[in-house]
Amino acid sequence: MKEQSPAPELWSTIDALSEWLDTNRPVEGREGLLLRILKLTEEVGEVSEAVIGATGQNPRKGVTHTWEDVQAELCDVVITALVALRTLTPEAREVFGGHLERVRERSVGSK
């Protein structure tokens, strides 16, 4: 598989999704913010469901998902996390980039 960097429009898409959600948010203020962050839990649960389905761990249901389903659900987790970060700060791109660099330095950068 060819390695790809994030699409150039990643952050503009995250901004657009955040704005769209803000426009259509049924709950405002702190509660709305908390609900947006809690959405991550729902998405992670969907990853778990897909893994269980891909491995056939539920004998009553058998194999119900594919590993491509797991990939899609993981992408949903990433998107939801970035939208939540963008909701917390308009500098989400810089915050994420700085944090990613710190993680890189303390792991692969320390070799």
What function would you assign to each model-found segment?
Residues M1-K111:
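Flexible "arm" and connector segments at domain edges
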